[in-house]
């Protein structure tokens, strides 16, 4: 059998000027996804994918690095303005927003979209250390 040569899939460059930055900040990790206004992902980064492991993933610095990488990748697609949607209780929320601004993206709006139950599921039992 003849060996197939591996084809390198090149990312096509989309021309999008406005985007939405979704920041999901949990107690363990921070996920930054930048999409177009329809919700199609343009760029993403996580604290874990940046090389942070264990408890270092949950630091504001790790969130900062993830936001910087996502912003740089999105700017390659032409994104200049972002609306920020923040979800979750983690420590990387503010750091990620500040880094998006520092990377050169113009933040037009910041919304907190953390889901709050109207007394839904019973929460897990409290930790005793």
From Swiss-Prot:
Signal peptide: none annotated. Keywords: Ribonucleoprotein, Ribosomal protein, RNA-binding, rRNA-binding. The gene is rpsK. GO terms for molecular function: rRNA binding; structural constituent of ribosome. This is Small ribosomal subunit protein uS11. InterPro entries: Ribosomal_uS11 (IPR001971), Ribosomal_uS11_bac-type (IPR019981), Ribosomal_uS11_CS (IPR018102), Ribosomal_uS11_sf (IPR036967). One of its GO terms (biological process) is translation. PROSITE patterns: RIBOSOMAL_S11. One of its GO terms (cellular component) is ribosome. It comes from Symbiobacterium thermophilum (strain DSM 24528 / JCM 14929 / IAM 14863 / T). Located on the platform of the 30S subunit, it bridges several disparate RNA helices of the 16S rRNA. Forms part of the Shine-Dalgarno cleft in the 70S ribosome. It holds the Pfam family Ribosomal_S11. It comes from the Bacteria. Coiled coil: none annotated. Transmembrane segments: none annotated.
